[in-house]
Structures are given as structure tokens and as C-alpha cells.
Amino acid sequence: MLDKQHEPDYALTDRQTDRQTGLIRLFQYVFGFAYVHLGDIAKYSTERIEAMELNADTYVGVDNLLSERRGKERSSYVPLEGRCISYNIGDTLIGNIRPYLKKIWLADCSGGTNGDVLVIQAKINFILPKFLYYVLSSDKFFVFDMQHSKGAKMPRGNKDEILKYIFALPPIEEQKRIVEVLDRFDKLCNDISEGLPAEIETRQKQYEYYRDKLLKFKEKKI
């Protein structure tokens, strides 16, 4: 759970994890949500996959992640040997070079990537992968990422600082409601992608506004 007096420690024992989970659920029950660090509820993938098992559809490099949250395209390069970082369906992949490009993708297949792409996996069973994706695709997150990035010409996200990102985590039913609303709005934006540029821009701004509003919560009155 969030403790502003101490730096978070994400290398927790099972007993500490159970206690942390209990505190999150208690705060959700009392206040309607709990403020958490990203590292409280998610982790970076440590699993590996052989490069020979990958193809242009399942290998994801930073170059075939599309800017402005547009997902990914097929890779023009696939390593032939060695081992890659593994990702699974429901993981969130984020380009870690020049975070301001907002390269992010919710995996709909399993595959592999390299060290220039972060693979973020939920480590608790009461956060929806799609909800976590929407949290991490927000402008607020990318601003935070840039504020803590390293390097001038080619800034790189700071993996340790990223795990300290703070957001509000509501109960699972509220997550489902938010995801359903944002999915409908996302579909609407995609449906008009062939329209006039001004209309597309207006819809996109509306989507971003409502996404940010839906990810903010007021405490319940006790």
C-alpha cells in the first residue's frame, strides 16, 4: 500500500503480500478506492523465450510499437538467436525510449521483446489487465515517465521510478464499468478514423478527457 513516509519495497514475502492485499481491499471498501504504487500491483516480466520461437507478428521491438497509443505493427526485424523477454496475453508493453512518443500496446498474443520495451504484468487478481492498460496509457502516466527519464537526446524511462507511479485502484466491478465505457469511446474514435481531421482530433480530445475523468475518484463519505 502507499506509504508516503517510506520508499516502497517491492521484494515482498508472501505474508507481506497478503497483508498488502488486505490493506488495499480495506481501503477500497472504506473509501471506494485505494491509492497504490504501480509496483504494489504489477511487475516487470522476468521470463524468457527463445528467439527461434518468434515471428514478425509475435516479436515486438520499440520500432514497431506505434506512437500515440496506436498499438503495434508487424516487425520488420526478428532476432534469429538468443533469448528475448517473454510477454503474455493481457500484459502491457511500453516503449522505454523517448516516452513522450506514448508507445503502448495491450498484448493480444504471447511473444517476446527486448530491453527497449517494458513488459508490465499484473501480480494481483483484482486488477483487470485492460484497466491497468488504460491507467498506463493516460497522459498523466507519460508525463510522470518523462519527468523521471534519463538522457537528453534519447531519453529512456527509469524502470525503478516507473514502479513508484501512483494511481487510484477501485474495486473490480468499478474497473469493469470504466473499461466498458472507455472501450465504447475507443471504438467510436476508431469508427471515425476515416473522417475529417478536425472531427478526428475533436473525438480524440473528448476520449482523453473522459478517460482521465473516469480514472479519478472521490472518497466515499463515511
Regions found by a protein language model. Give the residues of each.
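Charged, alpha-helix-forming regions
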Residues: 1-222
